Amino acid sequence: MTVIRLTRIGRKKKPFYRVVVTDSRKRRDGGWIESIGYYNPLSEPKDVRIDKERLNYWKGVGAKMSERVEKLSQKA
């Protein structure tokens, strides 16, 4: 199953996340199919960028979004 979720990058105590499309069996930071955005929780205001066109495409072909990505996509 294909899922849209966050992958953590950045360094210790300085998280930065990519919004990626990946197979549900992969590890959190394992290989991904496509990166469609990012989320920076440390900036003020929190910086969220998601490519809506690609998000809608992947939802259309059956990808499920994680709860956090659903909340972030409403803010973007």
Swiss-Prot record:
State the SUPFAM superfamilies in the record. Answer: Ribosomal protein S16 (SSF54565)
Q: Is Zinc tagged as a keyword?
A: no
A cellular-component GO term for this protein: cytoplasm
Gene behind this protein: rpsP
> What lineage does the source organism belong to?
Bacteria, Pseudomonadati, Campylobacterota, Epsilonproteobacteria, Campylobacterales
GO function term, MF aspect, one: structural constituent of ribosome
Family classification: Belongs to the bacterial ribosomal protein bS16 family.
Name the InterPro entries for this protein.
Ribosomal_bS16 (IPR000307), Ribosomal_bS16_CS (IPR020592), Ribosomal_bS16_dom_sf (IPR023803)
* Identification of the protein by name: Small ribosomal subunit protein bS16
